[in-house]
Amino acid sequence: MSQKTVKVQLVRSLIGTREDHRATVRGLGLRRINSVSELQDTPAVRGMINKVSYLVKVLA
């Protein structure tokens, strides 16, 4: 059984955002605007994406 994955792209700048939101974006493996990270689809990752949903876009 293969692991399900989710691709996340940073679409907004981190300037002016809360420190814990910046840390969450870094935890998702995103550095620059338009950077893409492919992560395992787990409840923890889903929660991180939900927390910073105004900064990121889910691609797949």
Curated annotation (Swiss-Prot):
The keyword Ribonucleoprotein applies. One of its GO terms (molecular function) is structural constituent of ribosome. One of its GO terms (cellular component) is cytosolic large ribosomal subunit. The keyword Ribonucleoprotein applies. Keywords: Ribonucleoprotein, Ribosomal protein. It holds the Pfam family Ribosomal_L30. Transmembrane segments: none annotated. InterPro entries: Ribo_uL30_ferredoxin-like_sf, Ribosomal_uL30_bac-type, Ribosomal_uL30_ferredoxin-like. One of its GO terms (biological process) is translation. Part of the 50S ribosomal subunit. Belongs to the universal ribosomal protein uL30 family. This is Large ribosomal subunit protein uL30. It comes from Cupriavidus necator (strain ATCC 17699 / DSM 428 / KCTC 22496 / NCIMB 10442 / H16 / Stanier 337) (Ralstonia eutropha). The gene is rpmD.
